[in-house]
Amino acid sequence: MKVTLIAILTCAAVLVLHTTAAEELEESQLMEVGMPDTELAAVDEERLFECSVSCEIEKEGNKDCKKKKCKGGWKCKFNMCVKV
C-alpha cells in the first residue's frame, strides 16, 4: 500500500512540474500585444528608403522608375516599397 501511495504522489508531482514548465514555455513564446516589433519596423524603413532613393536617382536621369530594389514580396509604388 505504501508503494502505491508513493507511486501516485510521485506521478502527481511529475505531472504538476511538467504542466508548470509547459505553461512557462508557452508564456515566453507569446508576443505581447501592443509592443512594436522594432526589427520588422527597421526592415520596413530600410526598404522604403532604398526604394525612394532608387526611384529618385532613376527619375533624375530622365528614365522610368524601374522597381529593382524591392524584392521578397515587396513592390515599389509611389516611390515606396509596399508589401504585396
From Swiss-Prot:
A GO CC term assigned to this protein in UniProt: extracellular region
The entry's localization annotation reads: Secreted
Q: Which GO terms describe its molecular function?
A: toxin activity
Propeptide segments, given as residue ranges: 23-47
Residue pairs linked by disulfide bridges in the UniProt entry: 51-65, 55-76, 70-81
Work out whether the entry's keyword set contains RNA-binding: no
Task: Kindly indicate whether the keyword Phosphoprotein belongs to this entry.
Answer: no
Question: How would you summarize where this protein is expressed among tissues?
Answer: Expressed by the venom gland.
Which Pfam family is one of this chain's hits? Answer: Toxin_20
Signal peptide residues are: 1-22
PROSITE patterns, sorted: HWTX_2 (PS60022)
Q: What is its main location?
A: secreted
Domain of life, per UniProt, equals Eukaryota
Q: Which UniProt keywords apply?
A: Disulfide bond, Neurotoxin, Postsynaptic neurotoxin, Secreted, Signal, Toxin
Regarding protein family, the annotation reads: Belongs to the neurotoxin 12 (Hwtx-2) family. 02 (Hwtx-2) subfamily.
The protein's job, in short, is: Postsynaptic neurotoxin.
Tell me what this protein is called. U4-theraphotoxin-Hhn1a
